[in-house]
Amino acid sequence: MPILEAPEERLRKFKYRGKDASVRRQQRLAVSLELRKAKKDEQALKRRNITTASDPFVQQTNGAKLTLQEIIHGVNASDPEQCFQATQAARKMLSQERNPPLKLMVEAGLIPRLVQLLRSSLHPCLQFEAAWALTNIASGASELTRAVVEGGAIQPLVELLASSHMSVCEQAVWALGNIAGDGAEFRDIVISSNAIPHLLALASSNVPVTFLRNIVWTLSNLCRNKNPCPCDNAVKQMLPVLSHLLQHRDSEVLSDTCWALSYLTDGCDERIGQVVDMGVLPRLVELMTSSELNVLTPSLRTVGNIVTGTDPQTQLAIDAGLLSVLPHLLLHPRSSIQKEAAWALSNVAAGPHQHIQQLIACGALPPLVALLKNGEFKVQKEAVWTVANFTTGGTVDQLVQLVQAGVLEPLINLLDIQDTKMVIIILDVIFFILQAAEKISQKENMCLLIEGLGGIDKIEALQLHENRQVALTALSIIERYFSEEEDAGTLSALLQDHECLTPLTKT
């Protein structure tokens, strides 16, 4: 509680105190994890290829549909034409929009034969159909993807990346993307099978944009997942090409490129540094101004990840123009963008007072206060964290500017919420503001302002809160700043039989 320890000790313990970089870093990661858990990922892990007649290798066959038993018999036939007809029939069943029989095909034992057919170099149309069938099986649940991997599909699929037939090559890319998207285990098997050099060569060649989209999506899945992260050598191979792809004009290519970079920056400072060293920050900030949500979202996520890194890395993002864009994104019509922007801003506010001053100078305070007043609750929470970081790392003059921006009214209004942790944070912010006012002999004026906003009544009511930490925080504020001197011993007496409370952190 504010009154229980020296201000310097409390500031050190509070979230993101600038002098303790290791603690700040751990807590920034905790905030990042919470944000990630709170929202669904916009990028698809896996994609199933639905039947289309536009591909040159898709031959329209006539006659009755084959039964599963006929498919099993035909796929294993030695006659290439019969084998093709059966494999295509299997692929069509696996490509139907509703309830494709993925598990049924696996249980029928088709995977080993489909893997064999991937090496039918004399029959590229057969390779294509087999790769397509495996692509769709791998798009299913993890157990089905595992069946494809354990059936030995990865190595022949990687070999098909060098096929002279573009459709075969593209289908192999798609299949590998689905396998890598299942998780770190299969991602690393794809990487160890030397897929990346082939994918990068394809990405750098003059392929149609539809093909390039699949390549970039597969590369993004090779950047995806942690515990463990993709190996350093793989990242070093991919980064130059990803950096180049950021200049592409196609929104889907840009989207998946940004997603790839967002996965790479969602980790250690060293990996963030590798991305930053590619010089991509100015372009990422530029893409944050895109009107296309599928580009804006991952570019904002990537830059948001970068500012969870070191203070110099955050400064590079600021130098790239981050703070000229964030205030506008705080007012974006989509609450998901507001939340991401507020989260990014909270990490800027978690830095030294120089970063906080740049935040003020860019005009971020008015839209931040607007979010505190009118944003959805999930957005208000991120805005509260931004203010909390601001008050712990800012100078007295900066806290004065925060108050002048009107932050107290919405904070006091939020004291009624049911989120106990948020209430504690808001009470701590109010304490820091009062402490700053005391330092410049403005305690009485600040108390009058809080009283005029209805703050005293709300803080007094919180003394009876069922959560002990809320109650004691409220009591300490009332006793220190709003009570008569003869009541000053109440808090210390109350605490005699109780342990001091743990410092506030976000988990």
Curated annotation (Swiss-Prot):
ARM repeat start and end residues: 99-139, 142-181, 184-224, 227-266, 269-308, 311-350, 353-392, 396-435
A molecular-function term among this protein's GO annotations: nuclear localization sequence binding
InterPro entries according to UniProt: ARM-like (IPR011989), ARM-type_fold (IPR016024), Arm_3 (IPR032413), Armadillo (IPR000225), Importin-a_IBB (IPR002652), Importin-a_IBB_sf (IPR036975), Importin_alpha (IPR024931)
Top-rank taxon: Eukaryota
Residue ranges of every copy of the IBB domain listed in the record: 1-57
General function of this protein: Functions in nuclear protein import.
Subunit and partners: Binds to importin subunit beta-1/KPNB1 via the IBB domain; this complex dissociates in the presence of RAN-GTP. Shows a limited binding to the RB1 nuclear localization signal (NLS), but not to the SV40, nor NPM1 NLSs. Interacts with RSL1D1.
Family membership noted in the UniProt record: Belongs to the importin alpha family.
Name this protein carries in UniProt: Importin subunit alpha-8
Organism encoding this protein: Sus scrofa
